[in-house]
Structures are given as structure tokens and as C-alpha cells.
């Protein structure tokens, strides 16, 4: 019992010291009454012996989120809710933003890049969960520049070391075609333009697969080719009523934006269909063009695997085929059937046109290269040649003697006076 104290409640002298965490207490062992307790906080005199902890060594619990980061986090949540993404997507996008914001290359960036970072986090989350969403859609919602967005997106993926799978084209076709306002009759859409969603979607998928097989999709933005394929699928289902409708009118009816390269992708896809139509026997008698071939898209898609093999040849095997033909011509095979009697006669039997090589459009129609002309030389050939330079052209002793003899004769002729 310290100092002969007693419990004020029961009067017991059995008092023990009990340390409660960092606060010492004097407790009665009989009734449990706390008789005295120490001071939990320190006094000013005690704090004089303590050492202050710097911010760099602290736990960072008192650190506050900046206003810019708070605003961007709210924008991440708002963007996920506008796109109607699941809550798990929202949490993942927020975590990606917080990780990216700690990087020095992004934290010290300008304000426009931080605003674009919001869309990059949402796009990465959607790509990882195989959610069909394009970069252009987010740029439209954020009013962001596409070049700045793509650069920030690649930088973020590289710095964070993320594994982002490529976008599935079939899922993108389904989500993009679902936004078309052509599946229900309305005052802005006449009844002849309304189409069944499943039929239009299935035919659009087949056209996009055909474009992929013929190198029209590789290295290009997907939305223009999907827009062109959707337009052709919509026209081919009821060609009598829809052939007069242009691509711009179709996009206006569907309430979607017309991508700039969609018209070029449409012409390329029509050229492929026209090439395939020349391989079908019942279509060879018809003089088809890019307008009338739309009526037969159903037949072309039904036999597209066979038609692609017959209408196009593999570009990689083209060189081997040419070498084989050269060897056969060198051996003299088939020369009597195709060449006339005279040396300048035309072939008697006309050869069949070879199929178009199956190559990307950039290789079939390469851009013209600018040829730089060589600089014009100032040497005309009439300049005087010095004696030291002439010695460079003399190679044999006989040439040296001849030159000396000719030079002496020239000097002697100059010394002879002219006759009066």
C-alpha cells in the first residue's frame, strides 16, 4: 500500500498500481475503484526535452488531398456514372488515378493533361474488363484532344506497367450499333427505314469480318469501317427503298456522327465486294457496279470464304509464283500455244486476268515519294586544264615524251613571226 492510502469507497488499504497503456493508475484490488491516475498529456516542461518529427518521416496521416485531385476524383465518378459502368469499375478507375497522380511525370504535368488522365483511367478499366468503349467516345465526353489523350494513355500504361488487352471488334460492333436510332419507328425515321436489330447486327458483323480478312481494318480506327459496314448492311436488307439514301443521310437518321474516313472505307469495301461478285457464275452476266452490287451482299457473304480465295491471291506467295512462271518460260513450255509465228505477232490465246493481290491498301496504292533532283554541276568541260592537272592523266613514259614534244612544237610555233 503506497503511503498508507485507503480506498475512498470501501476503506480498504489493498491498493495496487496498474499501468493502463501509457497512463499509470492506483486501483483498489477489492472494489476496483480508481483512486488516482496519472496525467495522459505532457506538460510544457516535458515537451522541451522532445524532438520534433519532420514531415518527410511522418506517417502522412494528416496529409490533405489537393483541390485539383479532389475535382478529378469527382470527375472519374461522374464519368463512370454517365457511361453506366458497374461500381467495381469506378473503384478500379479511382485507384488507377491515385497511383498515377503520385508519379512525378504526371503530378507535375499541366492542367490539360491531368484532365485527360481522368478519361485514361476509365478507358484502361473498361479495356481490362472487356467493356466496349472507344477512345473517341471519351474524348467527346471530355472535350479533349485525341492526340493528347492517346499520348497520355500510352504514358500511363508504360509508367504503371499495366496489361491492357486489345479491344474486341465484335463487342465494339454490338455496342456501337445499339446506339443507332433505326430500330423503332419515330417521327424522324420513316417506316421503310426501320430495321430489325438482330438482322442488321448479324450482317454488320459479317461485313466487318470480311473487311478484316481483306486488310481494311488493320492499323485503322474501327469506327469508320463499322459505320460503312452498318450502312451497307442496312441498305442490303431492303435495297429497293434504301439505295437512294446516302451515307450522310443514314448517319443523320441514325443520330450518330459521321466519321471523316467512313466514305473512303465505304468505297474500299464496295471495291472488295465488286471483286468478289466477278467470281460468282450467276453474277458474271450482270454488269454490276458499286451501286448495284449492294443487292447481292447476302449471296456474297454466304460464300465469302471461297470468293476471297478465288478473287484475291496471297501477296506473300506472289514472288514465288512469278519465279515458277519464269522457270517454265525458260524451259520453253507452252510457247507454241500462246506465241504466233512472227517475232512481232500478238499472242493467239488471251491470258486470263490474274487476281488482285491480297495486300493492305497502303501497299496496293503507296503514296507518291518526292524525288529530289541532284544538284546541277558547274563544270561544263570547257575549262582550262593546268599543267599539274594534266600530269595526273599521263600514265606511260611514251605519253610524257609525246606531250613534251607537242608542247615544244607549240612554243616554237608561237615564236615564229607572222609573214607580212
From Swiss-Prot:
Subcellular location, principal: nucleus
Any GO BP: transcription preinitiation complex assembly
Region entry Required for the formation of a ternary complex with DNA and TBP, spans: 358-364
UniProt keyword Cell inner membrane, yes or no: no
Entry's Gene Ontology molecular function annotations: RNA polymerase III type 3 promoter sequence-specific DNA binding; zinc ion binding
Localization per Swiss-Prot or TrEMBL: Nucleus
Residue span of region Interaction with target DNA: 108-114
Coiled coil: none
Modified residues (Cysteine sulfenic acid (-SOH)): 362
Keyword terms: Activator, Metal-binding, Nucleus, Oxidation, Phosphoprotein, Repeat, Transcription, Transcription regulation, Zinc, Zinc-finger
Region named Required for interaction with TBP and formation of a ternary complex with DNA and TBP: 366-420
Record has Transcription as a keyword: yes
PTM info: In response to oxidative stress, Cys-362 is reversibly oxidized to cysteine sulfenic acid. Oxidation of Cys-362 impairs formation of a ternary complex with TBP and DNA and down-regulates expression of target genes in response to oxidative stress.
Recorded GO CC terms: nucleus; transcription factor TFIIIB complex
Residue numbers of Phosphoserine PTMs: 354
The Sequence repeat ranges on this chain: 72-157, 173-249
ZnF endpoints (TFIIB-type): 3-36
Subunit and interaction comment: Component of TFIIIB complexes. The TFIIIB complex has two activities, alpha and beta. The TFIIIB-alpha activity complex is composed of TBP, BDP1, and a complex containing both BRF2 and at least four stably associated proteins; this complex inhibits the transcription by pol III via its phosphorylation by CK2; YY1 facilitates the TFIIIB-alpha complex formation. Interacts with TBP; this interaction promotes recruitment of BRF2 to TATA box-containing promoters.
Protein's UniProt name: Transcription factor IIIB 50 kDa subunit
Species whose genome carries this gene: Mus musculus (Mouse)
Amino acid at each position: 500500500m503506497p503511503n498508507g492510502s485507503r480506498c475512498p469507497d470501501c476503506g480498504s488499504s489493498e491498493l495496487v498500481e496498474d499501468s493502463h497503456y501509457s497512463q499509470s493508475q492506483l486501483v483498489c484490488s477489492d472494489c476496483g475503484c480508481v483512486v488516482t491516475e496519472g496525467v495522459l498529456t505532457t506538460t510544457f516542461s516535458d515537451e522541451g526535452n522532445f524532438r520534433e518529427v519532420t514531415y518527410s518521416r511522418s506517417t502522412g496521416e494528416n496529409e490533405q488531398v489537393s483541390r485539383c485531385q479532389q475535382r478529378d476524383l469527382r470527375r472519374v465518378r461522374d464519368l463512370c456514372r454517365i457511361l453506366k459502368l458497374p461500381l467495381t469499375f469506378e473503384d478500379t478507375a479511382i485507384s488507377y488515378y491515385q497511383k498515377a497522380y503520385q508519379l512525378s511525370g504526371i503530378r507535375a504535368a499541366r492542367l490539360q493533361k491531368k484532365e485527360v488522365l481522368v478519361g485514361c483511367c476509365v478507358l484502361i478499366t473498361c479495356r481490362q474488363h472487356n467493356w466496349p468503349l472507344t477512345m473517341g467516345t471519351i474524348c467527346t465526353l471530355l472535350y479533349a484532344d485525341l492526340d493528347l489523350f492517346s499520348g497520355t494513355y500510352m504514358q500511363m500504361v508504360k509508367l504503371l506497367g499495366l496489361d491492357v488487352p486489345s479491344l474486341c471488334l465484335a463487342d465494339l460492333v454490338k455496342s456501337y450499333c445499339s446506339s443507332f436510332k433505326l430500330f423503332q419507328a419515330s417521327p424522324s425515321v420513316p417506316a421503310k427505314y426501320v430495321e430489325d436489330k438482330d438482322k442488321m447486327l448479324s450482317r454488320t458483323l459479317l461485313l466487318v469480318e470480311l473487311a478484316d480478312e481483306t486488310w481494311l481494318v488493320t492499323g485503322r480506327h474501327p469506327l469508320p469501317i463499322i459505320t460503312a459496314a452498318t450502312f451497307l448492311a442496312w441498305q442490303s436488307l431492303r435495297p429497293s427503298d434504301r439505295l437512294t439514301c446516302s451515307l450522310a443521310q443514314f448517319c443523320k437518321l441514325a443520330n450518330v456522327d459521321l466519321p471523316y474516313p467512313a466514305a473512303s472505307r465505304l468505297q474500299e469495301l464496295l471495291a472488295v465486294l465488286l471483286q468478289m461478285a466477278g467470281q460468282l457464275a450467276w453474277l458474271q452476266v450482270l454488269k454490276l457496279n458499286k451501286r448495284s452490287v449492294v443487292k447481292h451482299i447476302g449471296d456474297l457473304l454466304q460464300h465469302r470464304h471461297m470468293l476471297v480465295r478465288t478473287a484475291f491471291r496471297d501477296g506473300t506467295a506472289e514472288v514465288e509464283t512469278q519465279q515458277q512462271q519464269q522457270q517454265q518460260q525458260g524451259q520453253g513450255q507452252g510457247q507454241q500455244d500462246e506465241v504466233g509465228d512472227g517475232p512481232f505477232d500478238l499472242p493467239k490465246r488471251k491470258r486470263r486476268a490474274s487476281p488482285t493481290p491480297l495486300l493492305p491498301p497502303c501497299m496496293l496504292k503507296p503514296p507518291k515519294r518526292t524525288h529530289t533532283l541532284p544538284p546541277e554541276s558547274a563544270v561544263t568541260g570547257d575549262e582550262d586544264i593546268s599543267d599539274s592537272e594534266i600530269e595526273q592523266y599521263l600514265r606511260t613514259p611514251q605519253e610524257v615524251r609525246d606531250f613534251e614534244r607537242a608542247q615544244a612544237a607549240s612554243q616554237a610555233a608561237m615564236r615564229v613571226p607572222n609573214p607580212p
